[in-house]
A protein has these predicted regions:
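Basic/polar N-terminal segments that are highly enriched at the extreme N-terminus
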Residues: 1-6, 192
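Conserved non-catalytic scaffold segment of RNase H-like nuclease domains
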Residues: 5-10, 15-119
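Hydrophobic, well-ordered secondary-structure scaffolds
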Residues: 1-3, 14-21, 160-164, 183-186
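Short, flexible loop segments at boundaries between secondary-structure elements
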Residues: 141-162
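Acidic active-site catalytic centers that drive phospho-/nucleotidyl reactions
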Residues: 13-15, 125, 149, 175
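Substrate-recognition/cap helix-loop segment adjacent to the acidic, metal-dependent catalytic center
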Residues: 106-109, 124-144
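Acidic, Mg2+-coordinating catalytic module of metal-dependent nucleases/exonucleases
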Residues: 116-122, 127-132, 160-192
Length: 192
């Protein structure tokens, strides 16, 4: 087997809408071991379906770029009909069509040698990442067909105390930063 150069380590996280049959990107955050970061929110997300999902509207949507103050200063808020009301700030430079995100993520991850990808509970994250380009076989050349799972690493380190989270949970870029912080503390990535 030929030697394949091992490139930089990237920690990433996605937030997504899933219904047991499909998984759709809401946002993606990526942190490279060299300090570069990427964060984007999918302007093509299915707003109506997300507005019906209590968990997403309580845990993910508040961390997205939102416009306006909402009802009584709350954005998102639950209407009398039981539906969540919120408005994505489409003027934010973080909000982009999925095809733009796919191109930018490809360029970001393949800027150097083939990347080594890491995520926390990585299975769904890798599917969401791969679906930026369609089917798994459509992954851009150089992107791995798997993501290393932080939880599997932590299982092998019985006495390891992982660092506390600094930021907000279910915010893709903050979650990716935390994964990188854990990888550094575990000795998988040199200290910055």
């Amino acid at each position: 087997m030929p030697d394949v150069p091992i490139g930089p380590i990237y920690a990433y996280d996605t937030e997504f809408l899933e219904d047991g049959r499909t998984i759709e990107l809401i946002s993606i955050g990526i942190v490279c071991e060299d300090g570069r970061e990427y964060y984007a929110v999918n302007s093509d997300m299915d707003h109506k379906r997300i507005a019906k999902d209590d968990w997403l509207c309580q845990n993910v949507v508040p961390h997205l770029p939102l416009s306006g103050k909402g009802y009584r200063g709350v954005n998102p808020y639950k209407s009398d009909t039981g539906r969540w009301v919120w408005s994505l700030d489409t003027k934010s430079t973080l909000v982009k069509p999925k095809w733009v995100i796919a191109n930018e993520v490809r360029e970001f991850l393949l800027a150097v040698d083939p990347p080594q990808l890491w995520a926390n509970y990585a299975a769904y994250d890798h599917v969401v990442l791969a679906q930026l380009w369609g089917r798994m076989i459509s992954l851009p050349k150089g992107l791995p067909m798997f993501t290393h799972d932080l939880q599997q690493l932590l299982e092998t380190m019985a006495d390891f105390e992982k660092p506390e989270k600094d930021g907000t949970e279910h915010n893709a870029i903050e979650d990716a930063r935390w994964v990188m912080k854990v990888l550094r503390a575990a000795g998988k990535v040199p200290s910055a």
